[in-house]
């Protein structure tokens, strides 16, 4: 009987050691998975940063030329508006005088297509 209880004790101890080894293996596996996940996330972040930087440089190159065109168009528009304003200032009095002259100096006359009914 003592040998049986000793055998049972050995089996229980062996089972306990096996359970500990399995638990340790699970912990190691969980750590490896966590580490692999962190490494993968770091790679993804690095790739994302590289692609974002590449996109920004291409966008800057494309928008840089458009920015110059936009500035040129805006400057040309300003020059035209200034030219129109100065022309308006120069011709304002003359146009007003012409307009008032046409309105106030009425010369009544018969229309050339008018036929007197006889």
UniProtKB/Swiss-Prot annotation:
One of its GO terms (biological process) is pH reduction. Belongs to the V-ATPase G subunit family. Residues 56-69, 78-89 have a biased composition (Polar residues). Subunit of the V1 complex of vacuolar(H+)-ATPase (V-ATPase), a multisubunit enzyme composed of a peripheral complex (V1) that hydrolyzes ATP and a membrane integral complex (V0) that translocates protons. V-ATPase is responsible for acidifying and maintaining the pH of intracellular compartments and in some cell types, is targeted to the plasma membrane, where it is responsible for acidifying the extracellular environment. It holds the Pfam family V-ATPase_G. Residues 25-90 are annotated as: Disordered. Residues 8-57 form a coiled coil. Expressed in brain (at protein level). It is found in: Melanosome; Cytoplasmic vesicle, Clathrin-coated vesicle membrane. This is V-type proton ATPase subunit G 2. It is a peripheral membrane protein. Gene3D superfamilies: 1.20.5.2950. It comes from Bos taurus. GO terms for cellular component: clathrin-coated vesicle membrane; melanosome; synaptic vesicle membrane; vacuolar proton-transporting V-type ATPase, V1 domain. One of its GO terms (molecular function) is ATP hydrolysis activity. Its main location: other. It comes from the Eukaryota. Keywords: Coiled coil, Cytoplasmic vesicle, Hydrogen ion transport, Ion transport, Membrane, Transport. V-ATPase is a heteromultimeric enzyme made up of two complexes: the ATP-hydrolytic V1 complex and the proton translocation V0 complex. The V1 complex consists of three catalytic AB heterodimers that form a heterohexamer, three peripheral stalks each consisting of EG heterodimers, one central rotor including subunits D and F, and the regulatory subunits C and H. The proton translocation complex V0 consists of the proton transport subunit a, a ring of proteolipid subunits c9c'', rotary subunit d, subunits e and f, and the accessory subunits ATP6AP1/Ac45 and ATP6AP2/PRR. Residues 35-55 have a biased composition (Basic and acidic residues). InterPro entries: V-ATPase_G.
């Amino acid at each position: 009987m003592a040998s049986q209880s000793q055998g049972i004790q050995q089996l229980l101890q062996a089972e306990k050691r096996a359970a500990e080894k399995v638990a340790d293996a699970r912990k190691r596996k969980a750590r490896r998975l966590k580490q692999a996940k962190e490494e993968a996330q770091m790679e993804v972040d690095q790739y994302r940063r590289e692609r974002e930087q590449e996109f920004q440089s291409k966008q800057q190159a494309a928008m840089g030329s458009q920015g110059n065109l936009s500035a040129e168009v805006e400057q040309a528009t300003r020059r035209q508006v200034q030219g129109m304003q100065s022309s308006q200032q120069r011709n304002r009095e003359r146009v007003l005088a012409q307009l008032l002259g046409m309105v106030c100096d009425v010369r009544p006359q018969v229309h050339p297509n008018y036929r007197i009914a006889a």
